Amino acid sequence: MDFKASGTKFKKTGKKVVPAKAFEEIVQTNRDVLKKSAFLSDLLENLQPHLNNIKKIRCVAIGNFKEDFPATYQFALLLEITDYIKSEDERDVVVSLYDPIFTKEEIQYLKSLGSKWLIEEEFSENDAIDYESVLYFLPHAPLDLTENILSSQRPHLWLANNMISHTDRYTKAKLCENYPNLSKLVHYLQTNAPPEVKKAHDVDGFATFIPKRKRKNRNNSSKLKVTPSDIDYDSIAPKFKSCQILTDFDEGKYLKEKPWINSFSDLTLHAIEY
């Protein structure tokens, strides 16, 4: 996780905040900010066609939502989503959460929200055919956790880091080696991406470093290119049939330079098909 548990009080200082108010007041203030944002409007608009199918929200890696500034905003977003489903579909949605760093206070608080709020380390969709019934919310989840869930579950709606930008530090070959399921989905996204996006993320064709003293005697055109052998994506994670981005919030413009700072940086709503 990116955030470590440390104390129970908070004031906004970098990643931490301090409560001059009660936690509920802070969350409500954050929710009021979100309600006025183009970000939330965009998200709810793109969730609207799927509301009838969503029966559960699985939220993992949210962090210490009563202590950390980003996690508090992420928790406020989770509440906005659950309330929106209730207002539109007249039903409560089940919320399944887990993070190993939850404090006793946070666990007690979640239990106080009612029987629809569950703390579950192990999570399994009851019916593989009904995979569209779960909305996954993984704010700032590490790649290992992302790969694990993609491998063990059948997520359809995936609200998490943008799969392309979150993995762009890896070559295609290295991504496939370390995170094969994620690699397959990134391949789908890049295949359907606009030309300028493909070019920006085509990290496999890079020039070999040549010391300055040797460059003097070489023509730029002679620099070697490292190109991995073609990857057989058809043989990787065959359960996946496609992946698309439903919204990246106007290429992240709705997420930047806002009161929530980096709480939602790189957040994207994906749809995975099987």
Curated annotation (Swiss-Prot):
This is SRR1-like protein BER1. GO terms for biological process: microtubule-based process. Belongs to the SRR1 family. Involved in microtubule stability and kinetochore function. May be involved in protein N-terminus acetylation and/or proteasome biogenesis. It is found in: Cytoplasm, Cytoskeleton. It comes from Saccharomyces cerevisiae (strain ATCC 204508 / S288c). Present with 6490 molecules/cell in log phase SD medium. One of its GO terms (cellular component) is cytoplasm. It comes from the Eukaryota. PANTHER family: SRR1-LIKE PROTEIN. Keywords: Cytoplasm, Cytoskeleton, Microtubule. It holds the Pfam family SRR1. The keyword Cytoplasm applies. Its main location: cytoplasm. InterPro entries: SRR1-like (IPR012942), SRR1L (IPR040044). The keyword Cytoplasm applies. The gene is BER1.
